[in-house]
Amino acid sequence: TTLLRCLNFLEKADGGTMTFDDETIDLHKVPKRTIARIRKKTAFVFQNYNLFANKTALQNVTEGLIVGRKMPKDEANRIAHEALKKVGMEDRSDYYPSQLSGGQQQRVAIARAIAVNPEIIYFDEPTSALDPELTVEVLAVMKRLAQEGMTMLVVTHEMNFARTESNRVIFMEKGVVVEQGSSKEFFEHPKETRTKEFLRIFQE
């Protein structure tokens, strides 16, 4: 989670670099212009949805388009309706967050991310606050996005999802990268002892 927040400049990194669109950025010292430029190409789906309680599902999706991107309201509404339809929430566009289940709120949050047409979506443990049944509906939306070619960086403990949908896995523990590689290599031929221990627990 901390790494993800540093990559989106929600927290300041102590050091390190990030390469985005062939541009290498010093994460400890990033000009505001660079932050704004990169954020326009990314979207963030939070663990606890982060929806505005006083706005409908539709308004939650249009807010960033109208306020952040200065888009005309009619165009923002059209894009928002399309995004809500994509996540199966078009019939709940006039509902407030309090009227939606956790899974439905997270799908609205994903629609909000899709609406800005990002190059990459960051997901911060998007199912950790959900019960198993609601987790399934959110993962189904994410699988569909993956199959459509959306680039996603996902912090997750959903190992089945990671195994079937990812093309690259990074296993971290206590802020340190333990192992990384292709999904196939990671799950079928792990190299590090700690990775093998972790996967053994998961497989049991």
Across the structure, where does each feature detected by a protein language model lie?
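ABC ATPase NBD coupling module
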Residues: 25-43, 73-74, 189-190
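Catalytic Walker B motif of ABC-type/P-loop ATPase nucleotide-binding domains
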Residues: 121-124
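Conserved signature/switch motifs of ABC ATPase nucleotide-binding domains
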Residues: 95-98, 116, 148
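H-loop/switch region of ABC-family ATPase nucleotide-binding domains
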Residues: 156-157
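Conserved ABC transporter NBD signature motif
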Residues: 16-26
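Helix-to-loop junction immediately C-terminal to a conserved catalytic motif
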Residues: 8
